[in-house]
Swiss-Prot record:
Highest classification ranks of the organism: Bacteria, Bacillati, Bacillota, Bacilli, Bacillales
Requisite cofactors: Mg(2+); Mn(2+); thiamine diphosphate
Keywords: Magnesium, Manganese, Menaquinone biosynthesis, Metal-binding, Thiamine pyrophosphate, Transferase
NCBIfam families documented for this protein: menD
Organism, as annotated: Bacillus velezensis (strain DSM 23117 / BGSC 10A6 / LMG 26770 / FZB42)
Biological function: Catalyzes the thiamine diphosphate-dependent decarboxylation of 2-oxoglutarate and the subsequent addition of the resulting succinic semialdehyde-thiamine pyrophosphate anion to isochorismate to yield 2-succinyl-5-enolpyruvyl-6-hydroxy-3-cyclohexene-1-carboxylate (SEPHCHC).
Subunit structure as annotated in this protein's UniProt entry: Homodimer.
Protein name: 2-succinyl-5-enolpyruvyl-6-hydroxy-3-cyclohexene-1-carboxylate synthase
Length: 578
């Protein structure tokens, strides 16, 4: 007699494949044997083995970012599942679709002291969109139909907007090994068992017309763009800006700063000049239209938060509530194309001259001043991003670590015509799991990835480097090593000289060349920008791990950074007579 696990779990895995899932990230373990073996045996599913569960969770996250569809994440019972938690949280807040399948002991072995058995019910709390504890395997037609329906529902829940993680806890009795000779994927197969149809999110036309009529009469407006995924959405936003003659304040994750599209209306230096009160007042808008999550820039956030006279319109197709300013806003839950068409219908075509030109003037002057800063100083981290955007291979991706790297990208990354994409984990903004996320992204895009990361974040996720060795992933790591938490040097904590280094600076003194040796990668530590280019360009699109370490100084960079921006402010205000 065939073990019921074979056709029950086989049908489960098969329905995921029929529903469009192509990838499963699997962590080794005994209780998850049927899930792992049958996923590996399925002809339409690619299995990615990750030994460490925390790393695996973030690898799946990066893979799902690349695929823009759900990815399965499989582990055994016990604390293995708990190690997925940070990645599940990030997936929740960044709206990335994951299907977490945790194997479990059968009901009779729960809460009785059985080994490797913990309470896995609602393990991820409110950070998953859907949770269920599946029934124990049975082979009768009703149960095979049930488990297929459950798989289809999981894919639907993870993929519908707002996308996010779902969790199915799968109790399994021994024997755990399925019979691969028993045609495990064919029972109850009748095409796709569950089909879900979705469409473009629209909005009440009367309400939308009222909002767009208000915008049509606005002369001083701007568009703010956070992270954006689709090319069509980018083009719609550019078309809207051209129609309204509003500047676009483009976060680096919007990918509006790079690519072949027209960038005449793109403002890329706003993080620098919005720190000055006089410049802010001169550029103060009456209305702001925002797409995507709140951008990285703190000066922009504070401006929108603290000026109640700025009317805010937040367009969010997913129907979420992404407004940390809490300054009051019009929440518009519709697809950007619907919003664009409504504005087009209400637009009068009259716009005063001078408003857009003001933004362009300030932006160009600030960008010119930042470009004129010394390019020879290897200790100035801002130069990394100015160099990198001209060196990164066309069609590749840059994954940016949190803390200082993403902020420096925001400040120093210029608009230009080369085609690549910029990614980061900005859901919960943690420094953990960044290496593994970049690895998953690289595997998903099948194109080179350059990871820019600080030393503490790199240390957090050294385990993630194993994927580069095992899979031959073309990952180049630009390691910004200031021996500690560089961001704290910009914060008030730095004034406490007694406790700062111990509690916040946290130097490690690690020699990272050994990490390259451990994981079979190359390592260089250039001392000039020419040496940096010579180290980066030949390796950037080659398979395997390549670490380029840039040693910088936390203390001196703070003053250099401040002096640079203050000098730019003085020059622009003098020229503008502010």
């Amino acid at each position: 007699m065939t073990n019921p696990i074979t056709h029950y779990i086989g049908s489960f895995i098969d329905e995921f494949a029929l529903s469009g899932v192509t990838d499963a990230v699997v962590c080794p373990g005994s209780r998850s044997t049927p899930l792992a073996v049958l996923a590996a045996a399925h002809p339409d599913i690619q299995v990615h083995i990750q030994i460490d569960e925390r790393s695996a969770g973030f690898f799946a996250l990066g893979l799902a970012k690349a695929r823009q569809r759900p990815v399965m994440l499989i582990c055994t019972s016990g604390t293995a599942a708990a190690n997925f938690y940070p990645a599940v949280i990030e997936a929740h807040y960044s709206r990335v679709p994951l299907i977490v399948l945790t194997a479990d002991r059968p009901h009779e072995l729960r809460e009785v002291g059985a080994p490797q058995a913990i309470n896995q019910h609602f393990l991820f709390g409110n950070f998953v969109k859907f949770f269920t504890d599946s029934a124990l395997p049975e082979e009768n037609p009703q149960m095979l139909s049930y488990i297929r329906t459950l798989a289809g529902r999981a894919v639907s829940e993870a993929g519908k907007r707002p996308m996010g993680p779902v969790h199915i806890n799968v109790p399994l009795r021994e024997p755990l090994m399925p019979d691969l000779s028993a045609a495990p994927f064919e029972r109850m197969r009748k095409g796709r068992h569950v089909s879900v149809t979705t469409g473009i999110q629209s909005a009440d036309q009367d309400s939308l017309c009222h909002i767009t009529e208000r915008l049509a009469g606005t002369e001083r407006g701007m568009i703010v763009c956070g992270e954006i995924h689709g090319e069509a959405e980018k083009q719609q936003i550019i078309a809207l800006a051209e129609m309204l003659q509003f500047p676009i304040l483009a976060d680096p994750l919007s990918n509006l700063r790079n690519g072949k599209h027209d960038k005449t209306l793109i403002i890329d230096a706003y993080d620098s000049f919005l720190k000055d009160e006089a410049i802010k007042e001169a550029l103060r808008p009456d209305a702001v239209i925002r797409f995507g999550p709140m951008p990285v820039s703190k000066p922009l956030f504070l401006w929108l938060r603290d000026d109640p006279a700025i009317e805010q319109f937040i367009v969010d197709e997913d129907g979420g509530w992404r407004d940390p300013t809490q300054a009051g806003a019009h929440m518009i839950h519709c697809h950007p194309s619907v919003f664009l068409e409504a504005v087009r219908s209400a637009e009068t075509g009259k716009r005063p001259s001078g408003w857009l030109e003001k933004w362009q003037f300030v932006n160009e002057r600030f960008r010119s001043h930042l470009q004129a800063a010394s390019m020879d100083d290897l200790s100035f981290e801002g130069n990394v991003y100015r160099q990198l955007q001209h060196l990164v291979p066309e069609g590749s991706s840059i994954f940016v670590g949190n803390s200082m790297p993403i902020r420096d990208v925001d400040t120093f990354f210029e608009k230009q015509d080369r085609s690549f994409r910029v990614y980061a984990n900005r859901g919960a903004n943690g420094i953990d799991g960044v290496v593994s996320s970049a690895m998953g992204l690289c595997e998903g895009t099948k194109a080179p990835v350059t990871l820019v990361i600080g030393d503490l974040s790199f240390y957090h996720d050294l385990n993630g480097l194993l994927a580069a060795k095992k899979l031959g992933i073309p990952l180049t790591v630009i390691l910004i090593n200031n021996d500690g938490g560089g961001i704290f040097s910009f914060l008030p904590q730095a004034s406490d000289k007694t406790h700062f280094e111990e509690l916040f600076g946290t130097p490690t003194g690690l020699d990272f060349r050994h990490a390259a040796a451990l994981y079979g990668g190359t390592y260089t530590c250039p001392e000039t920008w020419e040496a940096f280019k010579d180290a980066y360009q030949p390796q950037a699109d080659k398979p395997g791990l390549h670490i380029i370490e840039l040693k910088t100084d936390r203390t001196s960079r703070v003053q250099f950074h401040r002096d640079l921006l203050q000098a730019a402010v003085r020059e622009v205000k003098k020229e503008w007579k502010l």
